[in-house]
Amino acid sequence: MRKKIRSIHIILFVMLFLVGSFIDISTIHAEAGSRIGSIQIICKGRNSSDKEVTLSGAKFSIFPIQYMKNDELIWEDDFKDSGISLQDTSAEAREKQARQLFAFAKENNISGLTQETDTSGRTSFGELDEGIYLVAQIGNVESGTDKFESAPFLVNIPSEINGNVEYNVTIEPKAEWVSPETPPSNPDKRKDP
């Protein structure tokens, strides 16, 4: 009788061990699968009348700058020789770094994936691995007779937003109104009678 009880205990212990191992493995796979994120862009601006306008047709390109490997950020091959440090994470430093990285991309003919905003001023980039991404508007966008452009910016996947770690990040870049070009006046030029 003792042997039967002992055998039952051993069988139960082995079953609990196997079930516990399965749960741990499932948790690891679920965590690994949740390390993909996205960036949604909502593009709006204020026109010359200070009215908010939705900017459809704005083209944005995304460039992977660094990726996560073994809990360490590694430079993407295209940008590893840029000489730009990303150590300073202040807002001012990030603005400067984004401008420098975009200039480096243009100088070295590095192209990113480009998307255009829809009629609601939205576009998104999905299936993004953990890392740092440069997002830049390509050219400017028109709304009526007004033109708008936004500065390039850096986005971390994941990002800490309001104390929460977010893998799906929504960005509203500051689209600046570009004053229309006025033809230069030439006072020396004679007018035809």
Model features per residue range: what roles?
Residues M1-P193:
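Solvent-exposed loop/turn and edge beta-strand elements of beta-rich ligand-binding domains
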